[in-house]
């Protein structure tokens, strides 16, 4: 029986393998969720660089949000990363949910990023 950490790593690698197959050179919008915060970044895997990022740890977001661990905070992060991505010249991305299911905070980031101008 695999430990929880091994199972998460295996699930994340399976998702990333599927993303790599359909990416066609597009950068990926990678989302990570912890119990207290949420992080999102647009990564260009070809160049190995992060093009834009946002998280609930940023000073301006921490002061305006009640907590970094709810759906409202995730939506703000999604909107912010989309805004920064469009400013960096990124329109089309592939969504990398990692080992997390597409529900709740992960879904809120994705929907807010779509509203912010990213296509996936």
Curated annotation (Swiss-Prot):
Cross-referenced Pfam families: Ribosomal_L18p (PF00861)
GO MF terms held by the record: 5S rRNA binding; structural constituent of ribosome
GO cellular component: cytosolic large ribosomal subunit
Entries under InterPro entries matching the protein: Ribosomal_uL18_bac-type, Ribosomal_uL18_bac/euk
Coiled coil: none
Top-rank taxon: Bacteria
UniProt KW keywords: Ribonucleoprotein, Ribosomal protein, RNA-binding, rRNA-binding
Key word rRNA processing present: no
One GO process term, biological-process aspect: translation
Purpose: This is one of the proteins that bind and probably mediate the attachment of the 5S RNA into the large ribosomal subunit, where it forms part of the central protuberance.
Assigned protein family: Belongs to the universal ribosomal protein uL18 family.
Complex and partners: Part of the 50S ribosomal subunit; part of the 5S rRNA/L5/L18/L25 subcomplex. Contacts the 5S and 23S rRNAs.
Name this polypeptide is given: Large ribosomal subunit protein uL18
């Amino acid at each position: 029986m695999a430990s929880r950490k091994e199972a998460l790593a295996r699930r994340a690698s399976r998702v990333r393998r599927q993303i790599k197959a359909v990416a066609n050179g597009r950068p990926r919008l990678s989302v990570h969720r912890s119990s207290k915060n949420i992080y999102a970044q647009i990564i260009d895997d070809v160049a190995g660089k992060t093009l834009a990022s946002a998280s609930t740890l940023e000073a301006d977001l921490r002061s305006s949000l009640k907590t970094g661990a709810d759906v409202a905070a995730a939506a703000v992060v999604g909107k912010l990363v989309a805004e920064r991505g469009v400013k960096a010249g990124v329109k089309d991305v592939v969504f990398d949910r990692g080992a997390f299911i597409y529900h709740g905070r992960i879904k809120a980031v994705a929907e807010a990023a779509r509203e912010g101008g990213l296509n996936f």
